[in-house]
Each structure stands twice: as structure tokens, then as C-alpha cells.
């Protein structure tokens, strides 16, 4: 794809179900990877180190957003069903 400046745009990476599952499993245990581990995962999943790095960056942002939203749903003090504090 070419953008307005005539530059070729890089295509969006599509991950297979297997790759996504393996990346999610790794993320569950480690939100941050060492370079050595990133190389191992890239090799095992036939992806580049850069793809692994960016996937983890994006996943951390998603995790942060999810936890931020979850904490906003917690009421700081007990509310009665009528909207007044007890």
C-alpha cells in the first residue's frame, strides 16, 4: 500500500491462533522479556524480534488499560441502593 507521500506502508502483521496463544501464555508469566527470551520466542514462532517486541509493548498497554478500567469500576466507599453512602 502506498500513502499520500508515495511511500510504501508496511502491512499489518497477522498472527496465527497458535502464535497468539503462545504469546499470551508468555505474557501471563512475564510482561517484560529479556533479549535472550525474545530471540527464543521469535525463533520458535517464526516471527522477528521486532514483531515480538512490538506485540509485548501493545499487550502491556492493553493490560494497563484493562486494569485502569477495572479500578475505575470500584466504588471507594459503600453506596446504598439509593445512591447515598450508608
From Swiss-Prot:
Classification via InterPro entries: Antp_homeobox_Deformed_sf, HD, HD_metazoa, Homeobox_CS, Homeodomain-like_sf
What domain of life does the native source organism fall in?
Answer: Eukaryota
Q: Which residues bind DNA?
A: 8-67
**Keywords, comma-separated and alphabetical:** Developmental protein, DNA-binding, Homeobox, Nucleus
| BP terms from Gene Ontology | anterior/posterior pattern specification; positive regulation of transcription by RNA polymerase II
Q: Name one GO cellular component term.
A: nucleoplasm
Instruction: Note the CDD domains from the entry.
Output: homeodomain
Q: What Gene Ontology terms describe what this protein does at the molecular function level?
A: DNA-binding transcription factor activity, RNA polymerase II-specific; RNA polymerase II cis-regulatory region sequence-specific DNA binding
Output the Pfam families linked to this UniProt entry.
Homeodomain
Main localization, broad class: nucleus
What does the UniProt entry say about where the protein is found? Nucleus
Family, as annotated: Belongs to the Antp homeobox family. Deformed subfamily.
Please give the function described in this protein's UniProt entry: Sequence-specific transcription factor which is part of a developmental regulatory system that provides cells with specific positional identities on the anterior-posterior axis.
Q: What is this protein called?
A: Homeobox protein H55
Q: What organism does the UniProt record list as the source?
A: Apis mellifera (Honeybee)
Amino acid at each position: 500500500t502506498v500513502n499520500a507521500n508515495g511511500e510504501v506502508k508496511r502491512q499489518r502483521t497477522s498472527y496465527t491462533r497458535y502464535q497468539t496463544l503462545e504469546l499470551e501464555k508468555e505474557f501471563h508469566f512475564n510482561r517484560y522479556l529479556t533479549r535472550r527470551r525474545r530471540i527464543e520466542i521469535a525463533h520458535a514462532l517464526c516471527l522477528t524480534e521486532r514483531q515480538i517486541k512490538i506485540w509485548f509493548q501493545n499487550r502491556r498497554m492493553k493490560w494497563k488499560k484493562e486494569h485502569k478500567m477495572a479500578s475505575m469500576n470500584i466504588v471507594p466507599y459503600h453506596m446504598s441502593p439509593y445512591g447515598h453512602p450508608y
